[in-house]
């Protein structure tokens, strides 16, 4: 059996004195796409944040290459890309400046690569304009352009289709599936029904793990 890149072991999460889920198990290997589903308040975003190392579990642990996630910050940055529900961009900066800044935190990217990534998400001609002049959908595309740069193998995405039009949704679906088919991994939440799923797709319903 292939060793997982990321593994959740007996994971439990409590928020505001309420146990959202417990005893959760998850293994991620190349080619996997995992959709986290469940009713509102079931802990979908909390689970993503736990897997991304942005929160600590109430009990259990998250392992990266078999070792505790919290002890491997540099290794985590090399292996994982997180895009949250909010666009997470600086509105006074341009799309190019935002991507340059985000990439500089982990792996700097050439200007040509950044422009190609922005073109891939339909932002050709908007590279140098302040992001506060862009629509919500365009701002979302700025964040998603990171997926078109040289990026880590594991993508953790919270509602990535938010504010995208029909064409943008179809393009992103294809890109996510292609990433998995090339050996990458995706964990995501979405209220959108996926039309394009790789062979490694599976759904985890947090209702099964509710306390």
UniProtKB/Swiss-Prot annotation:
Function: Part of the ABC transporter complex CcmAB involved in the biogenesis of c-type cytochromes; once thought to export heme, this seems not to be the case, but its exact role is uncertain. Responsible for energy coupling to the transport system.
PANTHER family: ABC TRANSPORTER I FAMILY MEMBER 1
Domain of life per record: Bacteria
Chain positions recorded as ATP binding sites: 38-45
Listed name of the protein: Cytochrome c biogenesis ATP-binding export protein CcmA
Main location: membrane
Enzyme class name: translocase
Species per Swiss-Prot/TrEMBL record: Pseudomonas fluorescens (strain ATCC BAA-477 / NRRL B-23932 / Pf-5)
Membrane topology: Peripheral membrane protein
Catalysis performed (reactions): heme b(in) + ATP + H2O = heme b(out) + ADP + phosphate + H(+)
Record Gene3D superfamilies: P-loop containing nucleotide triphosphate hydrolases
UniProt entry tagged with the keyword Transcription: no
Family, per entry: Belongs to the ABC transporter superfamily. CcmA exporter (TC 3.A.1.107) family.
Molecular functions (GO terms): ABC-type heme transporter activity; ATP binding; ATP hydrolysis activity
EC number: 7.6.2.5
Gene: ccmA
């Amino acid at each position: 059996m292939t060793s997982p890149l990321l593994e959740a072991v007996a994971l439990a999460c409590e928020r505001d004195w309420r146990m959202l889920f417990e005893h959760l198990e998850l293994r991620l290997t190349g080619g996997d796409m995992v959709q986290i589903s469940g009713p509102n308040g079931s802990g979908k975003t909390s689970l993503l944040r736990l897997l991304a190392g942005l929160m600590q579990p109430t009990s259990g642990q998250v392992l990266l290459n078999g070792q505790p996630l919290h002890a491997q910050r540099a290794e985590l940055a090399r292996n994982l890309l997180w895009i949250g529900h909010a666009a997470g961009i600086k509105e006074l900066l341009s799309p190019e400046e935002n991507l340059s800044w985000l990439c500089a935190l982990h792996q700097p990217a050439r200007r040509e690569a950044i422009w190609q990534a922005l073109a891939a998400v339909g932002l050709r001609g908007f590279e140098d304009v302040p992001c506060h002049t862009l629509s919500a959908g365009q701002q979302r595309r700025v964040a998603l352009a990171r997926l078109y740069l040289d990026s880590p193998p594991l993508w953790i995405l919270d509602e990535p289709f938010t504010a995208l039009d029909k064409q943008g949704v179809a393009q992103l679906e294809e890109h996510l599936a292609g990433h998995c088919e090339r050996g990458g991994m995706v964990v995501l939440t979405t209220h959108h029904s996926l039309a394009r799923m790789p062979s490694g797709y599976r759904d985890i319903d947090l209702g099964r793990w509710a306390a």
